[in-house]
Amino acid sequence: VFDMYRIGIGPSSSHTVGPMRAGRNFISLLRNKHLFPEVEDIKVRLMGSLAATGIGHATDSAVLLGLMGKSPSVIDVDSIPGWIQDIKEKDRLLLDSCKPIPFHYSTDLTFEPSVLDPYHTNTLIITAFDDKGKELLTRKYYSVGGGFIETEEEAKLKQEPRALPATEEDKKALPYPFSTANELMEQCRKHGLSMEAVIRANEEVIRSREVIDDSLDHIWSVMSMCIDRGLNAKGC
């Protein structure tokens, strides 16, 4: 349920949320590999569809916000214009919101719409360098839809793009596993359960009933807030 109904900024899950998650994931990798203190330069390449429609979908801003450590589910949308303006005017990126590094938007972030990866058209590469220009870490990401991302390494293990779980917890064994609508209906028939009961039982393996109910209430609250925000906003 929380892979299908997830809170994130727009206008696109594949071109905005996914790239932001990629940037945030890259920061986590730098920290996990103890490379973060050495980073003095970051390069971002947007390719294929991410580049072709990147400006309209704010893909460029999304990646930078992810590199700042921002999460698409809790980001303060009113602060985004100021953060991006600060990057462009000061030629500086606040990595993970704590480490300032030089960043020239016009040269350190490139749009390459003609570069098409055979695995998926929504492709980006992020590379980190030290103060001597030595490459510290590079990762190719695919934004495969719905806000899901895959690394190049993960993609090599698959025959075709497939969305990964949003969290490691989602990989736990489920009492009523299914991957298609037909399999879901078969679980219902086999165990004499409603569709709602099957879904609820699977969810409660991952999270408590209280957490599920509170999270669903929060999602509805954000939906309502988005409606109100849209109705009260001015301009195109």
Where does each model-flagged region fall?
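Conserved phosphate/anionic-ligand binding catalytic regions in large, soluble enzymes, centered on
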Residues: 5-23, 56
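N-terminal glycine-rich anion-binding loops that anchor highly charged ligand groups
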Residues: 2, 34-38
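C-terminal regulatory domains involved in ligand/effector binding and gene-expression control
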Residues: 72-236
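Electropositive phosphate-/nucleotide-binding environments in soluble metabolic enzymes
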Residues: 16-20, 57, 213, 217-221
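Short, hydrophobic/aliphatic alpha-helical segments
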Residues: 1-8, 43-46
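Hydrophobic alpha-helical scaffolding
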Residues: 12-16, 49-53, 209, 213
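A structural-propensity feature for long, helix-poor, extended segments
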Residues: 37-76, 80-93
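Intrinsically disordered, low-complexity, positively charged segments
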Residues: 21-32
